[in-house]
Amino acid sequence: MKIYLTKRIVVLTWLICSYSMLNAQSWSKSFTAGGYDSDNKFLGGSEVLQLVNHKSMLFASVGYWEDENNIWYGGFNTNIGWGQINRLDNPSAIWQEDLFMGANHLRPEILKQVIFTKDQFGNLLTSPDTVLIAAGYSPNYITNIVTVTSFARNDLNGTWGESEIVQGGFPAGENYSIRDIEMYVDQQTGLEYVFATVGTQGIYKGKYNPANPGKIDWISTAEFGPLSIRPLGIEVANGALHFSSGSKLYRRIDGVSPSYVIDHDFSDLGAKINSAAGGIRGLTTINNPSGVDDAFLLMWCPNGQSQGTIYRLEPDGAGGFNRIYETKLSLLIASFLVGSNASYVLGAYNEFYEYINPISNDTIHLVGFEANISGGGHPIWNGYYKGGLFAKRDSNGQYSIEEINGTIGANDTALVANRCYVASPFPGESAVYFGGFDPNSNASTNMAWVYKKDYQVNAIDDITKHETNFVIYPNPSSNQLFIESENLEDYEFNIINLLGKEVVSGRINGQTATVDISSLPPNVYILRIANEAVKFVKTN
């Protein structure tokens, strides 16, 4: 049936966008360290470092720093206590060990999904290859050699292949700490690389090789380095690759012989950088609120007096950045934990996590942290607030604090630091998963945790009816969604799930558009065009 949209047709009235809040929200624990999976493999760990959605599964990287299951901290079983990647197949399943990294890999330093689009020669692949990558370093105390290795998951059989990035001499630790990886295409040569920050050794790169079980052929010489402070983030913004090290933000100059320049420096703040804190943390590309280009969001944590200050860097038009103060977490903590004083705040362990709130249509960024506090009578663990806190940033740059699983009790297990967060990958589940801990050099056996916050889809209240200027059909739909309008031309549209994550986007060029939704899991979604929105149902 062909539908014509004319002035005589009554514009579709639908349930739209005056949504106040998701009132039915509940917390539950998804992972508790110290148990076993269905194959009787031990799942312990002191902290969950990353949570990643990959092909409708949820993966968690788990480390054993300061965990007494590890032989370096008093353990006796050499077959447990090393870094793991665990997997959750559905919300009601139990976590499974997916990768055991092996002896001397104390923790996975990074877990990230990357998408390869080109071969080693710069030619486009027939179809992109989406790969889950983990990486870490392993010190050998017999040979005094440190080996940095990446692991790539084979999704066909669930195994992991390895690729060596680099080897070097002692000491280990921050010299080989691989905290981030990023895909980038050199704008001059057209070659695609995966870049890795390898501690003070510098910036390394590799190319896609499907014949390699580890998927990547790494170049064992640093493209740039050594560095005085380990980099904690690497990002693409405004068509260029950037990374942070200490107080400095570097930009790559592309070409056959690439180089790096400093685009911004926080040295004027006068803080001495403690390498453990790192300086610039959580480097994240965001939309520039003052322009049409990209800006950066970051947390400034230079040393033991860090207050968790968040800055935004906006391009200044001359190759550098203007620095804009956004907030100081220590002040927000003092308001949230009444009567307390936060003498030290460390956060942005990975990135500022972005999602779109489907209720307000607002873009939110989450960032976790830990706080050393005094006063107010709040429960503490080795000086740190015992509960897990995270901050939420709205699109106006305003911040608020929330606590994982509600206010923690004096007898509850310590959560301390929220290190990571990700939207649920599971069809029919509207939830955000959170993970973390951070031993802070204290004994921390089986302290790793994952909580999830559920949003009940049927709990959206204050829904009012408005007339929209567009028609969508069919609704419900299983494969394609058609959009028709007389008035909207060359408008951007977005499809958002009920966690606020953008899952499809595109443009209406003219009066009609066809949107492929076949890959979306069955659920309720919101289609947003300009300042209007409409709800639809995706079916099998």
Residue ranges, per PLM feature:
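C-terminal outer-membrane/trafficking sorting elements
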Residues: 13, 462-540
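Trp- and S/T/G-rich repeat-edge/linker motifs of beta-rich repeat architectures
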Residues: 25-46, 53, 65-134, 140-184, ...
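Long, charged low-complexity terminal regions
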Residues: 369-371
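Short hydrophobic/aromatic-rich beta-strand segments that constitute the beta-sheet cores
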Residues: 60-61, 97, 162, 196, ...
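A short, acidic, flexible beta-alpha connecting loop/helix-capping segment that sits on the rim
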Residues: 423-425, 436-442, 532
